[in-house]
Amino acid sequence: MAPTKKGEKKKGRSAINEVVTREYTINVHKRIHGVGFKKRAPRAIKEIRKFAVKEMGTPDVRIDTRLNKAVWSKGVRNVPYRIRVRLSRKRNEDEDSPNKLYTLVTYVPVTTCKGLQTVNVDEN
């Protein structure tokens, strides 16, 4: 690596270590296109998990039971096209765990996903 030039800021700590909560709309339909009927809902759960790992940068992802019920609400074949989720990056209380942070994925019930964008949610 080249030495830092005069006037350049030094890199601070990574934003991945911050505790943060965001709401996303996931287009499940495009992620399970071409998947066989009996594997659609299980694949949707796997794709939501993959999305959370990519967005939050934590390999430890925990999916809420309400989100699981929402994905399975129309059966194994007819998964909802879009689903609104809240991704919360949290500190791991378990000391012997290899990961300092984990991501909790919860379901956000909405009537329609039209016009919704990714938003940061304030911690309450």
UniProtKB/Swiss-Prot annotation:
It is found in: Cytoplasm. One of its GO terms (molecular function) is structural constituent of ribosome. GO terms for biological process: cytoplasmic translation. Gene3D superfamilies: 3.10.440.10. InterPro entries: Ribosomal_eL31, Ribosomal_eL31_CS, Ribosomal_eL31_dom_sf. The keyword Ligase does not apply. Its main location: cytoplasm. It holds the Pfam family Ribosomal_L31e. Belongs to the eukaryotic ribosomal protein eL31 family. This is Large ribosomal subunit protein eL31.
